């Protein structure tokens, strides 16, 4: 499990603190120190219980956090269930594949918090998701880091708001940079956060074109490692159920590490949006650097996750603390 020494942790705190933002001024590491002082331990225990039941909870929670923050900010709006009068974010086609185990991590942590009288209805679902995301990263061997707290839960969740706001598996670096820039994230942040694909799985439907019908000249994307392409074709043959799952990282799918970048160097990025990070000269130097230096990657990932957690934060004037993470109060 990755560990940072004290000097590195202090350095990260200093780097992160130099980016004050009026929209995130309310965030602090001790936000619940008086109202729910054991919030982190309670959430961590709930996360660990869930992971013991299924490892899917790890990548599912990490992906859920990203999808939440990139659509109207980190406000747990992705948790909201649709109603006859409103189609919520989670039911947009780009979110349909979000695994239920990620949602359940938040639900179980919320139950654990509410069973503590001093914490009942004190901690936002947005903060629960943020804490749980850090905890699943650590559980998979990734870096531990301090989490800023104080988010309020969003009051709006619509499927239409998702459209065009999430990266796609065929995106190039220009498209990726544009999406991340919109959320005040740099190219380096984008590359670091893309490495979340070191965990979990994707569905055959997302890679079918790349391995069977790439274009009029090549049936297989020529940037794919040939042996890896054959493996993918065997796992996802023509006419296969598009819901069949395949590992994002063919080498260490259950470990958070920098193998993701080593895979890209070998042409083993599952999505086009992964492999372009190596084939594009603008991002290749960073991929090469982090492939050979896990400490540098971990440092960049912590910074990127902290910045991501500041996107679109709600306060008491445009948010609240939900009693049920899946429904508005």
UniProtKB/Swiss-Prot annotation:
Positions of the catalytic residues: 67
CDD domains for the chain: secretory_peroxidase
Induction or repression: Up-regulated transiently by a cold treatment.
Signal peptide region: 1-25
Cofactor: how and how many bound: Binds 1 heme b (iron(II)-protoporphyrin IX) group per subunit. Binds 2 calcium ions per subunit.
Residues reported to bind Ca(2+) 1: 68, 71, 73, 75, 77
A GO MF term: metal ion binding
Domain of life: Eukaryota
Cofactor(s) needed for function: heme b; Ca(2+)
Chemical reaction(s) catalysed: 2 a phenolic donor + H2O2 = 2 a phenolic radical donor + 2 H2O
Tissue: Slightly expressed in roots.
Pfam families for the chain: peroxidase
Amino acids binding substrate: 167
Keyword Hydrolase set for record: no
PROSITE patterns: PEROXIDASE_1 (PS00435), PEROXIDASE_2 (PS00436), PEROXIDASE_4 (PS50873)
Main location: secreted
Residues the entry annotates as binding heme b: 197
Single GO cellular component term: extracellular region
A biological process term (GO) from this entry: hydrogen peroxide catabolic process
Family in the record: Belongs to the peroxidase family. Classical plant (class III) peroxidase subfamily.
Name assigned to this protein: Peroxidase 35
Source organism of this protein record: Arabidopsis thaliana
UniProt gene name: PER35
């Amino acid at each position: 499990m990755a560990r940072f020494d004290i000097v590195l942790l202090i350095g990260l705190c200093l780097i992160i603190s130099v980016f004050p933002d009026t929209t995130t001024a309310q965030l602090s590491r001790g936000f619940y120190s008086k109202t729910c002082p054991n919030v982190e331990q309670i959430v961590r225990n709930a996360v660990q219980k869930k992971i013991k039941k299924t490892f899917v909870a790890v990548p599912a929670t990490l992906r859920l956090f990203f999808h939440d923050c990139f659509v109207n900010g980190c406000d747990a709006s992705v948790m909201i269930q649709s109603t006859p009068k409103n189609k919520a974010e989670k039911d947009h086609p780009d979110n349909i594949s979000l695994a239920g185990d990620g949602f359940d991590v938040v639900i179980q942590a919320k139950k654990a918090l509410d069973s503590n009288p001093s914490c009942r209805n004190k901690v936002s679902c947005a903060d629960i998701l943020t804490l749980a995301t850090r905890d699943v990263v650590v559980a998979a061997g990734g870096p531990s880091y301090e989490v800023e707290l104080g988010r309020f839960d969003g009051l709006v969740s619509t499927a239409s708001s998702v459209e065009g706001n999430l990266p796609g598996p065929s995106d190039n670096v220009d498209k990726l940079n544009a999406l991340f820039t919109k959320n005040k994230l740099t190219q380096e942040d984008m590359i670091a956060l893309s490495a979340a694909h070191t965990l979990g799985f994707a569905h055959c439907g997302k890679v079918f074109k790349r391995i069977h019908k790439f274009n009029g000249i090549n049936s297989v994307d020529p940037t794919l490692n040939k042996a890896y392409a054959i493996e993918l074709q065997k796992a996802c043959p023509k006419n296969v159920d598009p819901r069949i799952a395949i590992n994002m990282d063919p080498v260490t799918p259950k470990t958070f590490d920098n193998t993701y970048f080593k895979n890209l160097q070998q042409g083993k990025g599952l999505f086009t949006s992964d492999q372009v990070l190596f084939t594009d000269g603008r991002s290749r130097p960073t991929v090469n650097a982090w492939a050979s230096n896990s400490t540098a990657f971990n440092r960049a990932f912590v910074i990127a996750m902290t910045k991501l957690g500041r996107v679109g934060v709600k306060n008491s004037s445009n948010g609240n603390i939900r009693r049920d993470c899946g429904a508005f109060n």
